[in-house]
């Protein structure tokens, strides 16, 4: 989990996302304010903008870091294991948020996930790697197979299809 800067509010941290557009002599602009408000709105943090980071839950803090990245207004959002250290509720909340950012704002999301079921459920395209080499790439349900899981992770697994859950994997043995 990210270290928490002391004495910093949610809004101030998110404003750091605007640093690429500022200089030493330039004060924050209306465009900066709008970008920060948009990022806070996208991450459901408008009501927490004045809160100290230390007063937030782990899931809320993770959303603040995402809001900071969103404030940059780039077309691509890169996330490295965004659900690590979060409990199940906040994992799902965060993944639903990321999916909404992709669906509603057409952001390209590049995300590292180690939970195969999360990758199946929340990814449009996956790349599986082993020792720095791409082993499989494509649509999750086409490339995440028991053979690929055995090759990449050394794990025997079965896959099930459920009407409510969709496709999911159950690891069996090593």
PLM feature spans:
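ABC ATPase nucleotide-binding domains
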Residues: 152-174
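A short, surface-exposed alpha-helical micro-motif characterized by mixed small hydrophobic
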Residues: 119-121
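Helical segment within the ABC ATPase nucleotide-binding domain
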Residues: 92-105
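Conserved ABC ATPase signature
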Residues: 27, 52-56, 60
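Conserved ABC ATPase "signature" region
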Residues: 15, 30-48, 73
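Catalytic Walker B motif of ABC-type/P-loop ATPase nucleotide-binding domains
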Residues: 77-81
